[in-house]
């Protein structure tokens, strides 16, 4: 299959050295000025990220509290209770679909919500390691390019290699990856909306041990189907296929019992659809396993808290990096004097750290101001602590 492509008999590598004149002071200053604009954009973006994150977190927390106070659990999932029409309901049950999902090309058939075919091709992959050094007034860059063969699920474009000759990859795969999804999914009498079906993503590898080779030119080894003359010694261009599934929808002697999920959504007839809260958010929750309504909302609150802190950290980091880029020009102005340069670098980083911390806390306080003014005032006071510490250290250094 790989006769038209490069041999994979050995790993190959080569080294390339490039050089350019050492940049002068004005050139470095010009590059730093460009970085200031990028830093300013990053700095401003961080305010938007932090502020909107607080609004999102509070809206989500309010919606979850509202949902917990309103949710009801039907007596049975096998009948539709008219009194729950339009209400937020808590449903627990095994998934069920109307027909099998299949890939007839490989003889795969099973009851599931989703069936994924994952395709990989054996290809050349280029890796590079670079190092820079100064020699005779020149900045030299030494790059070592290494070529190895690996199974990859995406096409690796060998035209972008530093040296394509001897490392050529096919431009397309003979087989494509895809995911089949059941059109109708039920829990008892209730049909899941598309949004709930999308949340069923707990994919598990499908064992191919009991399947036969579907064609003469396809060989099964372990949990892969190989389009190869010899799977033990693949060549560039060879393809292997594996399968995974999510949401087993019927008891199976090999795969186990049907998958059980817990859903919290709005009941509309026999449909489970998104529920709109008073705060303008929507509730459409699916958890894998059997959970009470209280457990589901507790898990969602924990997830919301983790996401909030993660975005706060990302906002702080963006602000810190933006300030570093904006103040980099001061470092460039003194980089000709090694000792003073290092002191300035430490001072600028400390300045960026203090300012980023203070502004992050103030932005968080502004986000909370409308909803929780007392907490906002407390955070605002904490935000002043780094600035006060920084200011009290300055006179001390002058006295030294």
UniProtKB/Swiss-Prot annotation:
Tissue specificity statement from the Swiss-Prot or TrEMBL entry: Widely expressed, including in the cochlea, heart, eye, brain and kidney.
Membrane topology type: Multi-pass membrane protein
GO cellular component: endoplasmic reticulum lumen; endoplasmic reticulum membrane; Golgi apparatus; nuclear inner membrane; plasma membrane
Perinuclear space domain ranges by topology: 53-313, 367-368
UniProt keyword list: Acetylation, Cell membrane, Endoplasmic reticulum, Immunity, Innate immunity, Membrane, Nucleus, Transmembrane, Transmembrane helix
Residue intervals on the Nuclear side: 2-31, 335-345, 390-400
Cellular location(s): Endoplasmic reticulum membrane; Nucleus inner membrane; Cell membrane
Modified residues (N-acetylalanine): 2
GO biological process: innate immune response; nuclear membrane organization
Signal peptide (from-to): none
Molecular functions (GO terms): identical protein binding
InterPro entries: TMEM43_fam
Residues that span the membrane, as ranges: 32-52, 314-334, 346-366, 369-389
Summary of the function given for this chain in its UniProt record: May have an important role in maintaining nuclear envelope structure by organizing protein complexes at the inner nuclear membrane. Required for retaining emerin at the inner nuclear membrane. Plays a role in the modulation of innate immune signaling through the cGAS-STING pathway by interacting with RNF26. In addition, functions as a critical signaling component in mediating NF-kappa-B activation by acting downstream of EGFR and upstream of CARD10. Contributes to passive conductance current in cochlear glia-like supporting cells, mediated by gap junctions and necessary for hearing.
Similarity comment text for this entry: Belongs to the TMEM43 family.
Record-linked PANTHER family: PTHR13416, TRANSMEMBRANE PROTEIN 43 (PTHR13416:SF2)
Subunit architecture: Can form oligomers through the transmembrane domains. Interacts with EMD; the interaction retains EMD at the inner nuclear membrane. Interacts with LMNA and LMNB2. Interacts with SUN2. Interacts with RNF26; this interaction is important to modulate innate immune signaling through the cGAS-STING pathway. Interacts with CARD10. Interacts with gap junctions proteins GJB2/Cx26 and GJB4/Cx30.
UniProt name for this protein: Transmembrane protein 43
Origin species: Mus musculus
Origin organism lineage: Eukaryota, Metazoa, Chordata, Craniata, Vertebrata
């Amino acid at each position: 299959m790989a006769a038209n492509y490069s041999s994979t008999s050995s790993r190959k590598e080569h080294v390339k050295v490039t050089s350019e004149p050492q940049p002068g002071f004005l050139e470095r200053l010009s590059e730093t000025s460009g970085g200031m604009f990028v830093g300013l954009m990053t700095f401003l973006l961080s305010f938007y990220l932090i502020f909107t994150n607080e609004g999102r977190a509070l809206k989500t927390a309010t919606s979850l509290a509202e949902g917990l106070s309103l949710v009801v659990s039907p007596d049975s999932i096998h009948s539709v209770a008219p009194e729950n029409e339009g209400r937020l309901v808590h449903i627990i049950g095994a998934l069920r679909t109307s027909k099998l999902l299949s890939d007839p090309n490989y003889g795969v058939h099973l009851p599931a919500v989703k069936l994924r075919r994952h395709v990989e091709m054996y290809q050349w992959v280029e890796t590079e390691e670079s190092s820079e050094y100064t020699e005779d007034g020149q900045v030299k860059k030494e790059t070592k390019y290494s070529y190895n063969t690996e199974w990859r699920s995406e096409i690796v474009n060998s035209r972008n290699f530093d040296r394509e000759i001897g490392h050529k990859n096919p431009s397309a795969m003979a087989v494509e990856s895809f995911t089949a999804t059941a059109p109708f999914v039920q829990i008892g009498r209730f049909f899941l909306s598309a949004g709930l079906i999308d949340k069923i993503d707990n994919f598990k590898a499908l064992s191919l041990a009991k399947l036969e080779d579907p064609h003469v030119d396809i060989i099964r080894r372990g949990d892969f189907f190989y389009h190869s003359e010899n799977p033990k010694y693949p060549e560039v261009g060879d393809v292997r296929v594996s399968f995974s599934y999510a949401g087993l929808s019927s008891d199976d002697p090999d795969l186990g019992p049907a998958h059980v999920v817990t859903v919290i959504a709005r009941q509309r007839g026999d449909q489970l659809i998104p529920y709109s809260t008073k705060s303008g958010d929507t509730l459409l929750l699916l958890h894998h396993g059997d959970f009470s309504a209280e457990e589901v909302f507790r898990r969602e609150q924990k997830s919301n808290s983790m996401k909030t802190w993660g975005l706060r950290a990302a906002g702080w980091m963006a602000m810190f990096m933006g300030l570093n880029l904006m103040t980099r020009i001061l470092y460039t102005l003194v980089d000709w004097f090694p000792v003073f340069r290092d002191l300035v670098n430490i001072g600028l980083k400390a300045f960026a750290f203090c300012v980023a911390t203070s502004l992050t806390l103030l932005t968080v306080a502004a986000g909370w101001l409308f909803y929780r003014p007392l907490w906002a005032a407390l955070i605002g006071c904490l935000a002043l602590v780094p600035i006060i510490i920084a200011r009290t250290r300055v006179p001390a250094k002058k006295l030294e």
